[in-house]
Amino acid sequence: MNIVPELKNRESPLVFNEKNVEKEKIEALIEAARWAPSCFNNQPWSYVFVRGGDSTRKDLEEALSPGNGWAKKAPILVAVGAKPDEDCDMNGLPYYAYDAGLSVMSMVVEAEHLGLRTHQMAGYDEKKVRKALGFHESQRIIVLIALGYEGDVKSVWDKLEQRIKDRLAQPRTRKSTEKNFFFASFGNQHG
């Protein structure tokens, strides 16, 4: 099945090239994220782009979980926050987080389109990120994203844990459609 190549070819690299990301590309990423859909058009997200030389970079890096230490080499780290109080009050569900995810996905697809790579991370200390970057206490930190041009994994191969090497050696896969997609009712495979 043919789909948009930016979706099919997206990967989350562990190694980034040191090359700086051009200002025009960052602006395009911001526009892509900005135009994402959101419940009642609330747009509850906030993005902070942190470059290697920024004064907040060291504190942000210290907020990463040990397993995400590789992200320190990325030219840009992006923190995405969202405000629960700007949520749609529908069915008790956290639409602010869903909306932020839509915005992130829009940015990720645009990054792929521009020849950039992203690696989204859940491994971080939310309080440390909030303090390092000045997010308001009312904001939740939804995700951190390493952003840049993909580097050569061979340059760090000897330093990788075996479980990571094993994962990288496998082709990228997805669950079969029969496990997640149904018609008319849950479990119904017949469309």
PLM regions and their residue ranges:
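Acidic, surface-exposed loops and disordered segments
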Residues: 1-191
